[in-house]
Amino acid sequence: RKGWFKAMKSIAKFIAKEKLKEHL
């Protein structure tokens, strides 16, 4: 279960990075 939470966090971070790229 902990691994799943960690994976969700990394995915959220990745999505946030992609969104930032779009704004720049």
Swiss-Prot record:
Keywords: Antibiotic, Antimicrobial, Fungicide, Hypotensive agent, Membrane, Secreted, Target cell membrane, Target membrane, Vasoactive. When conjugated to gold nanoparticles (LGNPs) or gold nanorods (LGNRs), this peptide has great potential in cancer-targeting delivery and photothermal therapy. It comes from the Eukaryota. GO terms for cellular component: extracellular region; membrane; other organism cell membrane. One of its GO terms (biological process) is defense response to fungus. It is found in: Secreted; Target cell membrane. Its main location: secreted. Monomer in solution. Small size oligomers on the lipid membranes. Antimicrobial peptide that inhibits many reference strains of bacteria and fungi. Is potent against Candida species and multidrug-resistant Acinetobacter baumannii (MDRAB). Is probably localized in the cytoplasm after being transported through the cell wall and membrane. Is able to interact with cell membranes and enter into cell plasma to activate the mitochondrial death pathway to sensitize cancer cells for apoptosis, as well as up-regulates p27 to inhibit cell proliferation. It shows very low effect on normal cells, such as erythrocytes, Hek293t cells. Belongs to the cationic peptide 04 (cupiennin) family. 05 subfamily. This is Lycosin-I. It comes from Lycosa singoriensis.
